[in-house]
Amino acid sequence: MQLELLNEQGQAASKVDVPETVFDRQYNEDLIHQIVVAYQANARQGTRAQKDREQVKHSTKKPFKQKGTGNARAGMTSSPLWRGGGRIFPNLPEENFSQKINKKMYRAGMASILSQLAREGRLAVVDSLKLDTPKTKVLADKFKAMNLQSVMVIADEVDENLYLASRNLKNVFVTEPRYADPVSLVHYKKVLVTKGAIDKLKEMFA
């Protein structure tokens, strides 16, 4: 299988051979959905918290007498039935949101995403993305010349210049193959892979 090799103007300069085991796999929507949801679930910090009727700060005094008022009987204002009362089943910080995805499924799902991106024309190969200076404007101008507004770059090695130049650009994410994730691959409109990263992707997801 071959993919377009883009020049610095974003035009197809030539073709480059890529492994079919990574870039020409069958589209599996269910598997992609599963690994994306699992990745997002495993990234949750679990910091949400609510209080039950024992934790809310309320007086334990009976709000009104048991009989004679016409109201439903009430023991204290911390009851979940009252405004400001505790929750019946509160969310707790120790909740476990993690989902297990085995390595075989994850590799197959990532290869399916990369293959679908290639079929849609959203994935292309560049020779390299080296910068002589860590200037954001230099990288921004490079992407502007290639007509890229939302791009994920998978480079074989992210040096300091490339990292510093890209970290302040909106809708730009530069990473190495080992840190590529399904959510980012699905999110960005264009994915650029350097030639040196192709073998690493094959090693990881074939």
Swiss-Prot record:
Disordered: annotated span: 46-77
GO biological process: translation
Keywords: Ribonucleoprotein, Ribosomal protein, RNA-binding, rRNA-binding
Cellular component aspect of the GO annotation: ribonucleoprotein complex; ribosome
Known role: One of the primary rRNA binding proteins, this protein initially binds near the 5'-end of the 23S rRNA. It is important during the early stages of 50S assembly. It makes multiple contacts with different domains of the 23S rRNA in the assembled 50S subunit and ribosome. Forms part of the polypeptide exit tunnel.
Species for this entry: Acidovorax ebreus (strain TPSY) (Diaphorobacter sp. (strain TPSY))
GO MF terms held by the record: rRNA binding; structural constituent of ribosome
Family stated for the protein in its record: Belongs to the universal ribosomal protein uL4 family.
Domain of life: Bacteria
Protein name: Large ribosomal subunit protein uL4
Subunit structure: Part of the 50S ribosomal subunit.
Keyword Lipoprotein: no
